[in-house]
Amino acid sequence: MVDPGYEPNTVLSAVAERGLKVGAVLLTHGHFDHVGGAKEISKASGSCPVYLNDGDLELPSRLSCGIYRTAAYSEGDVITVGEAEFAVMQTPGHSMGSVCLLCGGLLFTGDTLFYRSCGRTDFPGGSPKLMRQSLARLAGMPGNPTVLPGHGPATTLGHERETNPYMTKAMRG
């Protein structure tokens, strides 16, 4: 499960209704709207691991809502959950510990890349310069994975290369 948000009961009900099992919780960054339910979901799922990059461990409590993490991941790691493999790409900018996760043809971007936009950089740990570098890196990825952002509709990396003003600016340098 990627970025379960802060309503664990809703998430756990949806998992149960579909007959699924949570094997791990993968957090793209440490902000409360992505991590708030991680501890409860982990406990309800047999204490499955909760992954977060070290870069977000020092976030102010008003942003992190008491981060819960049992495992760390960083650039180049591959996390296997069942039959799925998630390749970790560090993409700082929205926060120092932001990561994107590539699983087959799916790219989970958290708050790094949205449909025709990108995440804010004005929170503690945010950096406009690092965000531009991360967007340029994503733009340079091969292929056209489906982008599943932390907020808003899904898109494709190809669509964002063509239409996202933040990404096109980052590509120009």
Language-model segments: which ranges?
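Metallo-beta-lactamase
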Residues: S64, E85-Q90, S95-G173
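Active-site HxH/HxHxD metal-binding segment of metal-dependent hydrolases
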Residues: Y6-A84, E162-A170
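Short, flexible loop segments at the rims of nucleotide/cofactor-binding pockets, characterized by
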Residues: M1-P4, L27-T28, I67, M89-Q90, ...
